[in-house]
């Protein structure tokens, strides 16, 4: 029964991890640089399932090491190498998640395939450093029976503690602290919302709004925004509107449509407003009014033939005192809003992926903790804390 279960787990491990590698290498949506961690992790798990578990199963079923003595030493080194690499890969993935959540825009620009491959190389080097000592220093293995030879891990206390700390306890502690930090960042980000991030809603709420019926200081000056008020008054040319009389008479009839409240009020004649030269551009009028002052001109008989087309309000922008200020405000707000939404989407994606990895790592820690705890306990107090062989 045990052999059947272990055999099924071996096949399931090989098939499942092969699908992971195939999906990352063939799917366009999964070709992100950080998914190289998953490819390397899946490769380590496949090596464990093909080179380690079958020989461990045979050793447990037979009760002794049936294969060559040299292969026993290589087998033990590969066992430590692949298992340590698998654990350290999960630690590297957790650090990658933390940097992606805490510094999303900055880290994503630096998360290149070359950098990820370099981190993967460091992971394998760490695993190799931990697994090589048993090959170099074999220690006191004791007498080996000729009929039933054994293949056991290094029983030196210093190596047991060092390998347990480097292979499991240190990466496990790092992963727990990192995912706790990610949880706190995600929770704080969720509680703040767009206003705490300086989102577009907050910036728009701080913009001044003109009071209906009151002429603002900016409207009293011959600025460019005043030329946006009505199409006919652009470029210094006025056109009569329905229900509106000439100068000196009642300005508007009761049925005349009013200007939108967000548009600056237009000063009437006699309030210090000067009309620019008809047919000139808004920039030229502004420069002439600032330097020389624009003298009043008589209106032409045919406004339609003399006046240039009226300026249109940019879509999605706010009207302020000047046209230049209006354009800059609209573009700045849109850019800030796009950055905020891009960061929000990135954080949401990272948080979902982080949750899945947290579940995987939690199950992984629960599976590995009993072995490393009992393995380390045998080195700390070998006489009084001896773990039964069957439980180990």
From Swiss-Prot:
| Implicated in ligand binding (site feature) positions | 79
Top-level taxon: Eukaryota
**Stretches of the chain found on the membrane's Extracellular side:** 63-72, 141-156, 381-392
Q: Where is the composition biased (Low complexity)?
A: 296-315
Record flagged with keyword Secreted: no
Sequence ranges on the Cytoplasmic membrane side: 26-36, 96-117, 181-356
The record's note on quaternary structure and interaction partners says: Interacts with RAB26. Interacts with PPP1R9B. Interacts with GGA1, GGA2 and GGA3.
Functional description taken from the UniProt entry: Alpha-2 adrenergic receptors mediate the catecholamine-induced inhibition of adenylate cyclase through the action of G proteins.
Family label: Belongs to the G-protein coupled receptor 1 family. Adrenergic receptor subfamily. ADRA2B sub-subfamily.
- What is the official name of this protein in its record? Alpha-2B adrenergic receptor
User: Which gene specifies this protein's sequence?
Assistant: ADRA2B
């Amino acid at each position: 029964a045990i052999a059947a279960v272990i055999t099924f787990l071996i096949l399931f491990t090989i098939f499942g991890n092969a699908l992971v590698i195939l999906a990352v290498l063939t799917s366009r949506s999964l070709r992100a640089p950080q998914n190289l961690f998953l490819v390397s992790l899946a490769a380590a798990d496949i090596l464990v399932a093909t080179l380690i578990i079958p020989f461990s199963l045979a050793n447990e079923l037979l009760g002794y090491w049936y294969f060559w003595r040299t292969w026993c030493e290589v087998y033990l080194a590969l066992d430590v190498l692949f298992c340590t690499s698998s654990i350290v890969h999960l630690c590297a993935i957790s650090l990658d998640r933390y940097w992606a959540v805490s510094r999303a825009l900055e880290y994503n620009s630096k998360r290149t395939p070359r950098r990820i491959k370099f981190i993967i190389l460091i992971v394998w080097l760490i695993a190799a450093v931990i697994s090589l000592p048993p090959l170099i220093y074999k220690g006191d293995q004791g007498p080996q029976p000729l009929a039933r030879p054994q293949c056991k891990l290094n029983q030196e206390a210093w190596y047991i503690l060092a390998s347990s700390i480097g292979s499991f306890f240190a990466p496990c502690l790092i992963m727990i602290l990192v995912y706790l930090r990610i949880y706190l960042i995600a929770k704080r980000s969720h509680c703040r919302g767009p206003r705490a991030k300086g989102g577009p809603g907050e910036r728009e709420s701080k913009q001044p709004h003109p009071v209906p019926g009151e002429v603002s200081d900016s409207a009293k000056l011959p600025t460019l925004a005043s030329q946006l008020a009505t199409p006919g008054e652009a470029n210094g040319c006025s056109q009569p509107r329905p229900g509106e009389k000439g100068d000196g008479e009642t300005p508007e009839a009761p049925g005349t449509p009013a200007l939108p409240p967000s548009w600056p009020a237009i000063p009437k004649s006699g309030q210090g407003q000067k009309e620019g030269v008809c047919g000139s551009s808004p920039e030229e009028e502004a420069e002439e009014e600032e330097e020389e002052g624009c003298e009043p001109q008589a209106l032409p008989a045919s406004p339609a033939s003399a006046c240039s087309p009226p300026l249109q309000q940019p879509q999605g922008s706010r009207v302020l005192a000047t046209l230049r200020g209006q354009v800059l405000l609209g573009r700045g707000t849109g850019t800030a809003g796009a950055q905020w939404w891009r960061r929000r989407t990135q954080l949401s994606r990272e948080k979902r992926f982080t949750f899945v990895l947290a579940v995987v790592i939690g199950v992984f820690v629960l599976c590995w903790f009993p072995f490393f705890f009992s393995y380390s306990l045998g080195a700390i107090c070998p006489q009084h804390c001896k773990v039964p062989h069957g439980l180990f």
